[in-house]
Regions:
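Conserved donor NDP-sugar-binding/catalytic core segment of glycosyltransferases
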Residues: 97-129
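Glycine-rich, basic loop-to-helix element that forms the pyrophosphate-binding segment
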Residues: 64-80
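A conserved acidic beta->alpha catalytic loop
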Residues: 23, 38-47
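Catalytic core of nucleotide-sugar-dependent glycosyltransferases
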Residues: 201-207, 213-241, 257-279
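Conserved nucleotide-sugar donor-binding catalytic segment
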Residues: 142-217
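Short aromatic/hydrophobic "clamp" motif used to bind/position activated sugar donors
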Residues: 85
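N-proximal low-complexity "stem/linker" segments adjacent to membrane-targeting elements
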Residues: 1-26
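Membrane-interface aromatic/basic loop that binds lipid-linked glycans or pyrophosphate carriers
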Residues: 262-310
Length: 310
């Protein structure tokens, strides 16, 4: 039976950690280890983690000074001893059958990565986000699906990875946002086959203090830079292949406009640099949404919004 390492970064999640760990402890697949990396938490999260570790010998807790999410995930990777890895954020939780279903799919299809759907948990609502249909593909097809946002996303969670996918792959410590985007596609590059299953086994908890609650333009433009980095690397790896990143650039522009509208004032004189997008690749309803958001930005900022062509 293959061993699965569940990698959990912890920082000030005392309200959520027990639910996260309990959801893992009731997994129907039992050959697991839980690696908890305490990133200098200042609340009772460490006490909670150590209490669980004292009761279960497969839970291991390691504490460090605060270094950020990338370093914390890299430390978890260094401690992992499993054949497969599963990232779970400490404020999220998972369905009881998640690991069993995903590892069975990995074995059945000889896939190094299996990704599933998820629920967004927000203010009492549970909103499913599903890839819609099951699919198995080679690495190149998976990278194309990632570039077009079709069934594969840039989140490290919600995916079961063979340990080999993270050979010479680390999360970038120097990035201050969207570090996952620099990493997940590298893991996919190391996979021979990738499977998508539509079941929503992961529960992403959107809570106060999340990135979208205090976004700034540096972070928003970092999102686009991450997609540009992906696109450049993929064109270098596969010069004869077409990777259409227009939908991702569209999404990054919508995040930038959202940030401008909700977090900036006229006196700050923010700069908006539109992405270069082939609009023929974008759904008409998305195009309308973009026009509306640009109009709102213009109304809010007037001539104080600095427009700069990319």
């Amino acid at each position: 039976m293959y061993k699965v390492s569940i990698l959990i970064p912890v920082y000030n999640v005392e309200k959520y950690l027990s639910k996260c760990l309990e959801s893992i402890l009731i997994q129907t697949y039992k050959n697991i280890e839980i690696i908890i990396i305490n990133d200098g938490t200042t609340d009772s999260s460490l006490d909670i983690a150590e209490l669980y570790a004292s009761n279960y010998d497969f839970i291991h807790v390691y504490s460090y000074e605060n270094a950020g999410i990338s370093t914390t995930r890299n430390r978890a990777l260094e401690k992992a001893t499993g054949d497969y890895y599963l990232f779970v954020d400490s404020d999220d939780f998972v369905n009881p059958h998640m690991i069993e279903k995903m590892i069975n799919e990995a074995i059945r299809t000889h896939s190094e990565i299996v990704t599933c759907g998820y629920h967004i948990e927000y203010k009492g609502l549970s909103i499913p986000v599903s890839p819609m249909r099951k699919k198995n593909m080679d690495s190149l097809s998976a990278l194309r699906a990632l570039s077009q946002n079709k069934g594969i996303n840039n989140y490290p969670w919600g995916k079961l990875y063979a340990a080999s996918c993270f050979k010479d792959v680390k999360f970038p410590d120097e990035k201050k946002g969207f570090e996952d985007t620099y990493t997940v596609f590298k893991a996919i590059c190391n996979a021979k086959r990738v499977s998508i299953i539509p079941n929503c086994y992961y529960h992403y908890v959107k809570r106060p203090g999340s990135l979208t609650d205090h976004m700034d333009l540096v972070q928003a433009y970092e999102m686009r830079a991450a997609y540009e980095y992906q696109e450049l690397c993929l064109h270098q790896l596969f010069p004869k292949e077409n990777f259409y990143y227009d939908i991702n650039f569209y999404n990054s522009d919508m995040v930038i406009l959202y940030t401008l509208i909700f977090f900036y004032s006229r006196k700050e004189q923010p700069v908006y640099v539109p992405a270069v997008i082939d609009w023929s690749k974008i759904n008409i309803f998305y195009r309308i949404g973009y026009i509306v958001w640009r109009f709102i930005a213009c109304v809010k900022f007037g001539w104080s919004l600095k427009w700069q062509e990319n």
